Amino acid sequence: MKVLWAVLVVTLLAGCRADAEPELEAQEPAVWQSGQPWELALGRLWDYLRWVQTLSDQVQEELLSSQVTQELTLLMEDTMKEVKAYKAELEQELAPMAEDTRARLSKELQAAQARLGADMEEVRNRLAQYRGEVQAMLGQSAEELRARLASHLRKMRKRLLRDAEDLQKRLAVYKAGAREGAERGVSAIRERLASLVEQGRLRSALTSQPLRERAQAWGERLRGRLEEVGGQARDRLDVVREQMEEVRAKVEEQAEAFQARLKGWFEPMVEDMRRQWADLIEKVQVAVGASTPAPSQKP
């Protein structure tokens, strides 16, 4: 009776697996499409778990020899190492991000990373538990143990897929500066990206501007500079002209003063000489008149 019950359970589980497995398999390509190193490593782990889930004779043999858990441990370590490396690379790229935003995103990413690691750890522990149960066989048949393991593996693979997708989304958000909206506090990043886009658009417009327009702009600038220099030269010339007028006025004033002084010096001398000359002429005329004899009268 127990054997029949076990066969019935295995049949039902196999039917459930047949219904659930295509849905799970259909989701796989969307997970690893970008091909990041951590995704490729997780893909190898995923393929290995799919092979383990077949519970073939080889799988059973390797489960009992702990080879499966050892191989799974290596794949887990490789996956987590690639995740950490990719996260470190993103942190370097997003160093200019605001500290509070970067801390919030990093915390969310670490939580998703921890969930993925816990899922893989649970799978490994469950496989180790199965090996112990098979070795003990405490009142259970091998079919029952395999059925229970298959059921657990399906559930854990679904959980692993869900958490892997969540980690992938958060890494994409981290890489894009949290594009999912203001609820993640990334408005500053969007403003910075918008500013960079606007600067790029302006730079592109200036680069594609016709040469004639750019030459005209340079000509306007040069003309303005020449007018400025010419205005400064005219102002300087006016200052020099005013200074020359002041010098000329001073020279004329000094010349007039000197002329007045000369006139004051020589006019008395000239007047005295004129007076002396007039006296001399008068004396000569008197002397000439006195020496001339009077004319004789005839009878």
Curated annotation (Swiss-Prot):
Provide the positions where the record notes the PTM Phosphoserine.
Answer: S141
Instruction: Classify the main location.
Output: secreted
Q: What does the UniProt entry say about where the protein is found?
A: Secreted; Secreted, Extracellular space; Secreted, Extracellular space, Extracellular matrix; Extracellular vesicle
Q: Give Gene Ontology CC terms.
A: chylomicron; extracellular exosome; high-density lipoprotein particle; low-density lipoprotein particle; multivesicular body, internal vesicle; very-low-density lipoprotein particle
Q: Which residues form a coiled coil?
A: none
List the residue ranges of the region (Lipid-binding and lipoprotein association): 204-273
Which positions does UniProt annotate for heparin binding? M156, R157, K158, R159, G219, E220, R221, L222, R223, G224, R225, L226
- Where are the annotated segments for 8 X 22 AA approximate tandem repeats? 74-245
For the region Specificity for association with VLDL, give the residue spans.
Answer: 261-273
Q: Which residues form the signal peptide?
A: 1-18
Gene3D superfamilies, alphabetically? Apolipoprotein
Q: Which SUPFAM superfamilies match?
A: Apolipoprotein A-I
* Modification after translation (UniProt): APOE exists as multiple glycosylated and sialylated glycoforms within cells and in plasma. The extent of glycosylation and sialylation are tissue and context specific.
sequence repeat ranges, renumbered to this chain: 74-95, 96-117, 118-139, 140-161, 162-183, 184-205, 224-245
In terms of domain of life, where is this protein from?
Eukaryota
Family that this chain belongs to: Belongs to the apolipoprotein A1/A4/E family.
Q: Which PANTHER family match?
A: APOLIPOPROTEIN, APOLIPOPROTEIN E
- Subunit comment for this entry? Homotetramer. May interact with ABCA1; functionally associated with ABCA1 in the biogenesis of HDLs. May interact with APP/A4 amyloid-beta peptide; the interaction is extremely stable in vitro but its physiological significance is unclear. May interact with MAPT. May interact with MAP2. In the cerebrospinal fluid, interacts with secreted SORL1. Interacts with PMEL; this allows the loading of PMEL luminal fragment on ILVs to induce fibril nucleation.
Protein name, as recorded? Apolipoprotein E
